[in-house]
Swiss-Prot record:
It comes from Cupriavidus pinatubonensis (strain JMP 134 / LMG 1197) (Cupriavidus necator (strain JMP 134)). CoA binds at residues 197-200, 317, 536. Its cofactor is Mg(2+). GO terms for biological process: acetyl-CoA biosynthetic process from acetate. The keyword Ligase applies. Belongs to the ATP-dependent AMP-binding enzyme family. It is an enzyme of class 6 (ligase). It catalyses: acetate + ATP + CoA = acetyl-CoA + AMP + diphosphate. Catalyzes the conversion of acetate into acetyl-CoA (AcCoA), an essential intermediate at the junction of anabolic and catabolic pathways. AcsA undergoes a two-step reaction. In the first half reaction, AcsA combines acetate with ATP to form acetyl-adenylate (AcAMP) intermediate. In the second half reaction, it can then transfer the acetyl group from AcAMP to the sulfhydryl group of CoA, forming the product AcCoA. This is Acetyl-coenzyme A synthetase.
Amino acid sequence: MSAIESVMQEHRVFNPPESFVRQAAIPGMDAYRALCAEAERDYEGFWASRARDLLHWNKPFTKVLDESNAPFYKWFEDGELNASYNCLDRNLQNGNADKTAIVFEADDGTATRVSYRDLHAKVCRFANGLKALGIKKGDRVVIYMPMSVEGVVAMQACARLGATHSVVFGGFSAKSLQERLVDVGAVALITADEQMRGGKALPLKAIADDALALGGCEAVKNVIVYRRTGGKVNWVEGRDRWMEDVSAGQPDTCEAVPVSAEHPLFVLYTSGSTGKPKGVQHSTGGYLLWALMTMQWTFDIKPDDLFWCTADIGWVTGHTYIAYGPLAAGATQIIFEGVPTYPNAGRFWDMIARHKVSIFYTAPTAIRSLIKAAEADEKIHPKQYDLSSLRLLGTVGEPINPEAWMWYYKNIGNERCPIVDTFWQTETGGHMITPLPGATPLVPGSCTLPLPGIMAAIVDETGHDVPNGSGGILVVKRPWPAMIRTIWGDPERFKKSYFPEELGGKLYLAGDGSIRDKETGYFTIMGRIDDVLNVSGHRMGTMEIESALVANPIVAEAAVVGRPDDTTGEAICAFVVLKRARPSDAEAQQIATELRNWVAKEIGPIAKPKDIRFGDNLPKTRSGKIMRRLLRSLAKGEEITQDTSTLENPAILDQLKQAQ
């Protein structure tokens, strides 16, 4: 791939507040550089000393990194530990037993607090119940549940027994669930009767029944159902059991089974941009170490913080920064069942004010849709809420456009909270490139610098480094403890996907285009490599054009894809959501012309979208990710063949077929 041209310049810089630096885990850039130098000097020693200090090992490791079968790397492999013990038992031993582990807020606003002692007991009772059903170390259990304390209990109970969990997001269809049950070879499925979202009860057990009826799931002997709503469900005697009955009468202690550091803690399927889902397999030791280290470094977690990650446990963010990281750090966190727009789009700000949240971590797509709502209705604008408890903000899931970053910084953080714009992936296990809140000067739209120990670089299509200021392909040059171990059942696909021969088979391919600033070396993610457009020989990242569109005061959100064009090779197609009602006919044409001229002024005439399509919103998965493959099909006028079961709003597809 030739250098991606970066055509936007971002010059605003925001330094960490002095008061934050003074108390930070990593205070100032000298402290950051010292950690990076330590990792450069003695890479294995850097990781080993932290693994020994931060985790409880039943059997200490003597081997740090085994590269003999690269790229199937192993970390701490002769050591043994248990993830649930590290998250729960250690908190009982170090004085946190009565500390609140989870504040659960239901869809209807009811809040429940669960202490570390209570959580430990719930996990032990359920783990004992699973054991009584014959579930043991090495078995795979699929979890298809709503955001709930019980969802975390199910994950931790599997970890306690050494069973490998595979959480499937509660918005997936029966077919998607069945594919995952079959691929991972599940012996049990844990689900709920229904889930509550935005005041509506949505089926889960009924979808699980349909998935099992599709066949191939004969190994699933037990279906365990959490009674969330009390809604009517079909029941298969001998197979189906209520979660409360599985736990009933069980002792509230359960020995945590020690497993090898390399034992698969979980398999999490990514919807991979192509076809068959990929089961990303994560280890126990290396994964847990990084979950805890990044809680301390990126989120600067302190004993009195109230941490809120708005992700779902069905995604990796909900694994690392809900189910494992905060508990391993002994933190108090919020788990939220509902959606940001119910009962109105002030829900997030209201919850931050009521619970006095100090660290808030959410997705750019949520921020952008809430900007639109706030600007349309004064009553739910963040300025109506007391957000003074916040000290740190974060973003996750995709790059954040500079204008959305500025709105977040001013309106939510009141220009005093650092923003950690965290670049990472399902496959990386935890944060990779991110500002450190007490050290890194912030630049809107840039994820800044790799964490100490993460050897990120930008290369051309032959695997050679490109100079700062030239775009290229983001890679990681050395293995790190929390990295993906393999694709479940498909090691060849793992090698091809992440360690391609074209790059010499030794570099981890992130799949993102990126550029480093000439002076600061800061990384900016330009979008997925397959989101790079080639217009008349100019290569441009879609992210830049989207950022330019969103910088226009009338635009709430934009997504850009390419489509074949006889003249230019590829034409730019923009899907736009305005901060006002969707325009039509002559008005739509006029606004489309204005936006084309705006992009030409911001970036240059080469970046002008050929098609502009207006929708009430963009097609997104229920985790808020824009479904770009779907947009590519729409841009090309193709039939939609993708699985649209996770689509939040299917009706908008018709709107987006009309080009201006």
